[in-house]
Design a protein with these regions (language model features):
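Short helix-initiation/N-cap motifs at beta->coil->alpha
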Residues: 54-58, 109-118, 134, 238-247
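Bacterial signal peptide processing site
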Residues: 44-46
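A short, structured surface patch at a secondary-structure boundary
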Residues: 69-123, 127-134, 139, 234
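C-terminal motif of bacterial Sec signal peptides marking the signal peptidase cleavage site
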Residues: 40-42
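His/Asp/Glu-enriched short active-site or ligand-binding loop at hydrolase and phosphoryl-transfer sites
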Residues: 94, 218-242, 286-287
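Extracytoplasmic substrate-binding proteins
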Residues: 50, 60, 126-127, 137-214, ...
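Bacterial N-terminal signal peptides that target proteins for export
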Residues: 3-33
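Short helices/loops that flank or line small-molecule/ion binding pockets
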Residues: 117-124, 146, 244-254
Length: 317
């Protein structure tokens, strides 16, 4: 549980600490994404329709009218809401919801795990969106008991992104825009996969945290991103999303490249113990923007392009 909570804080929340840096995506690219979605969203579902969904806790979600006061304590869904053009409906966010820049203007209601229920209810939301962690089950129950619609979601795999987008689209009565956003992301992912399919597939170790040393497993969408980008995760045999490993085992698995955030790259370069890994000795430690590639949201396509160009320079532009 401790490793899983740390994994949330580093990858989903994107704490700028020890191997993690925060990069704010350009407003121009964000406007292009939203503009494409608007152009394709030609119709909406009737606003009187009641949305009946089951969230990732298996709890029912019933909303009679599109929500107008949303608290999103899940950075992935906050980004999606802005892509839907629904950012103005947000009345609360987690402290880690920093993209796009306009998200910073929304009141910060905590870190997104075990939220203060009274503070959140003080924002008078008609919908609360949580990260579907066991830590958040009690809060979800309390929000429902208070009569507030609550949606708990997690996106462990790329396929979960499409489902999450579709669910938000149904709740907002804007399924056409949801399809537009989803299709745009998957077109980009398809383009990256097509460009890397016939290329050599270097092996990769993804450095997430150093004390303890944490990496990603097959259960993480980031392993899927590595595959799409033309690489292979040396810990793809681990079924979970993350795992604690030893430096000696990393050396035995002998990755061609190491991926790490800016401070992680610095840590590896300064710690002589890492010299037992061939990729370190050969200078093949690659710096990634952990927030961009660590959130399975509307920038998944951008993340895949970034990784492909790291592993196969010049492949995509």
């Amino acid at each position: 549980m401790a490793v899983r909570r740390l994994f949330w804080r580093v990858l989903v929340a994107g704490i700028p600490r020890r191997g993690v840096s925060v990069l704010i995506f350009s407003h121009r690219s964000f406007r292009i994404l939203v503009g494409c979605a608007l152009a394709l969203a030609a119709c909406e579902q009737p606003r009187t329709q009641v949305a009946v969904q089951s969230d990732d806790f298996g709890d029912p979600v019933r909303i009679g009218q599109p929500p107008t006061r949303i608290v999103s304590l899940n950075p992935v869904t906050t980004e999606m809401l802005f892509a839907f053009g629904a950012g103005s409906r947000l009345v609360g966010r987690s402290q880690f919801d920093l993209w796009p820049d306009s998200a910073r203007l929304i009141p910060d209601l905590g870190n997104g795990l075990q939220p203060n229920v009274e503070i959140v209810l003080g924002a008078h939301p008609d919908l609360v969106i949580l990260y579907a962690s066991q830590d958040n089950r009690p809060a979800a129950a309390r929000f429902r008991a208070a009569g507030v619609s609550t949606l708990s979601l997690r996106t462990d795999h790329i396929a979960d992104f499409r489902r999450t987008v579709q669910m938000l689209g149904a709740i907002l009565r804007d399924s056409a825009r949801a399809r537009a956003v989803s299709d745009s992301v998957f077109r980009t992912l398809g383009r990256v996969r097509a460009a890397t399919t016939n290329l050599p597939r270097p092996t990769v170790f993804w450095h997430i945290w150093d004390a303890p040393l944490i990496t990603i497993g097959a259960g993480s969408f980031m392993t899927e991103l590595v595959d799409i980008a033309g690489g292979k995760n040396v810990y793809a045999d681990i079924t979970g999303p993350s795992a604690t490993v030893s430096l000696e085992d990393v050396a035995r698995r002998d990755p061609d490249f190491i991926l790490a955030g800016p401070q992680g790259v610095q840590k590896i370069s300064e710690d002589r113990r890492w010299r037992i890994v061939r990729a370190v000795r050969e200078g093949k430690v690659l710096k990634v923007d952990t927030v961009l590639v660590g959130r399975p949201g509307v920038r998944l396509g951008e993340a895949a392009v970034s990784l492909a160009n790291l592993l196969h320079p010049g492949t995509l532009h």
